[in-house]
Amino acid sequence: IFRQQAAIAGLAMKVDSAGTGDWHIGHAPDVRAQRHAKAHGYNINKLVARQVSADDFRKFDLILAMDAQNLADLQDIKDSISDTDGKLAKLALFSEEDPTYGGDDVPDPYQGDADAFEEVIERIESSAQAWIESWKTA
């Protein structure tokens, strides 16, 4: 979703997705997530889950976490990496720039119903757009 919104906005950037845990590595997104994403014009069925790696902190300028627990987990990983050049990625909450959600956690929809997936898609769209707008005006 973020990748597509950035492309539409004309921003040339690398966007990727990874989890802090290892329980979904190699799997496609949940079929409910695929269905709701498709209804919003996003094709996510070819995505494959991977786990965050130490290399990500050098490959990316910014790593966004969906919730406070993942942000803490990412900070722990970052703290374990030798940062001799001061160039490790910055960390932030995904909704940090979004005036609608103001740093709230993006809820995990997997234990919920269809409405939970719809809510998450809408939050991701809103927060991605907020980040894009913040970069365009910076």
Task: Walk through the language-model features, giving the residues of each.
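Conserved active-site segments centered on acidic
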Residues: 1-59, 133-138
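Phosphate-binding/catalytic loops
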Residues: 62, 68-138
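Small/polar loops that bind or transfer phosphate-bearing groups
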Residues: 17, 65-66
